[in-house]
């Protein structure tokens, strides 16, 4: 399995395929599980997928073909974030960890200003939480009732990150959750 990333031209040559991908798959654990054409068009117009601070990339595999998309955010910042969306037909096959590791390698290799790579997921997205851990990311925060979902439900959000130095060394620097003396 060889994973590669192809920049998406969301305003021109790739726009139709990009919109079709987002509309043709359901993302039940994302804020917008089934985005409309209007929502996608508005996001494109507002620069959510391109520009100096954002990038949209197709995730391709030499055997399986197109696996999904990743949106990179805060590229000019030292803490780049991502939104990963695998196509429905590729979920549940153990692809999340190798894909996330490949994305991490791409970010740290291509963006020398990035010191940390971050992502968040809903508290009930156990598959993605395991993926984060297997890819060397560390749980950094739990935000209670911070993730709105379709239908008005609100879930907790769990934040994960990997540091450049951990990626380079292949180690994991854990947090000291009991670092506030005198409390407990």
Where do the model's predicted regions map?
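Active-site rim helix/loop that mediates acceptor-substrate recognition in acyltransferases
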Residues: 33-55
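Acyl-donor (CoA/ACP) binding surface of acyl/acetyltransferases
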Residues: 1-24, 58-184
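A general structural signal for well-ordered secondary-structure junctions
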Residues: 27-28, 50, 113-114
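Helix-loop element at the rim of GNAT/NAT acetyltransferase active sites that forms part
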Residues: 20-35
């Amino acid at each position: 399995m060889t994973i590669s990333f192809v920049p998406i031209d969301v305003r021109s040559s790739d726009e139709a395929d990009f919109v079709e991908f987002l509309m043709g798959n359901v993302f039940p654990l994302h804020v917008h599980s089934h985005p409309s054409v209007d929502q996608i068009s508005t996001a494109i117009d507002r620069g959510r997928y391109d520009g100096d601070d954002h990038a949209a990339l197709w995730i391709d595999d030499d055997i399986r073909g197109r696996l999904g998309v990743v949106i990179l955010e805060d590229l000019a910042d030292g803490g780049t974030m991502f939104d990963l969306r695998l196509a429905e037909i590729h979920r549940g096959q153990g692809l999340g960890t190798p894909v996330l590791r490949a994305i991490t390698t791409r970010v740290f290799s291509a963006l020398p200003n990035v010191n940390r790579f971050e992502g968040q997921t809903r508290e009930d997205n156990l598959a993605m939480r395991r993926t984060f851990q297997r890819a060397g990311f560390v749980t950094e925060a739990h935000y209670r009732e911070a993730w709105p979902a379709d239908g008005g439900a609100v879930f907790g959000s769990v934040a994960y990150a990997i540091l450049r130095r951990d990626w380079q060394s292949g180690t994991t620097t854990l947090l000291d959750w009991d670092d506030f003396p005198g409390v407990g």
